[in-house]
């Protein structure tokens, strides 16, 4: 489990429309209710470490309720587009002491859920999404953000440490 209390201004591509971009541009679009199906796909990718054929964990259905069913667009999120192709996304989950995900630290600090499509890994999309989500959380009054990453996900660990996250605890497998 990681927490980030540095709120940084997003310095990557501004939020705009995928319709106004070329195929090489990275565009972040505010996630809406109509993106729920794509967020569900991204949630699957977080559970299987991006393995399209991977088996979901035993807790997948229970976790889906918190991470997807309870998410509403007013909680915040972004979809990354590379041209006209969705490349990943991030969404904020504002847990309570009673209902929360693996990365919950405390009420008022949103937990991020993030995934990038395999074909776009290593292109800075995860960084752009994290910066956008961090800025959004700051604008929404959060003193920090948190996330959870599986112990075996070394690539994600490197990214989060590089961006200033600190490990603040461990839960089984995370």
Residue ranges, per PLM feature:
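A short beta-loop-alpha structural element at the N-terminal edge
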Residues: 26-41
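Active-site rim helix/loop that mediates acceptor-substrate recognition in acyltransferases
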Residues: 43, 54-82
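Conserved acyl-donor/pantetheine-binding loop and adjacent beta-alpha core of acyl/acetyltransferases
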Residues: 81, 87-113
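A short, internal acetyl-CoA/4′-phosphopantetheine-binding micro-motif in the GNAT/acyltransferase core
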Residues: 111-121, 149-150
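Conserved GNAT acetyl-CoA-binding A-motif
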Residues: 137-148
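Conserved beta-strand-loop-alpha-helix junction that forms the acyl-donor binding cleft
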Residues: 147-156, 173-174
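Conserved acetyl-CoA-binding loop of GNAT-fold acetyltransferases
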Residues: 161-170
């Amino acid at each position: 489990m990681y927490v980030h209390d540095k709120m940084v201004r997003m310095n990557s591509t501004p939020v705009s429309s995928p319709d106004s971009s070329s195929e090489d541009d990275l565009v972040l679009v505010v996630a809406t209710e109509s993106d729920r199906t794509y967020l569900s796909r991204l949630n699957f990718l977080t559970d299987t470490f991006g393995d399209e054929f991977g088996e979901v964990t035993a807790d997948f259905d229970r976790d889906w309720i918190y991470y997807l069913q309870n998410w509403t667009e007013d909680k915040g999120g972004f979809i990354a587009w590379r041209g006209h192709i969705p490349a990943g996304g991030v969404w904020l989950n504002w847990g309570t002491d009673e209902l929360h995900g693996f990365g919950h630290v405390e009420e008022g600090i949103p937990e991020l859920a993030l995934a990038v499509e395999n074909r776009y890994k290593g292109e800075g999309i995860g960084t752009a999404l994290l910066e956008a989500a961090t800025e959004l959380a700051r604008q929404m009054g959060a003193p920090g953000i948190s996330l959870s990453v599986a112990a075996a996900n070394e690539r994600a660990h490197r990214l989060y440490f590089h961006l200033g996250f600190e490990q603040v605890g461990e839960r089984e497998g995370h």
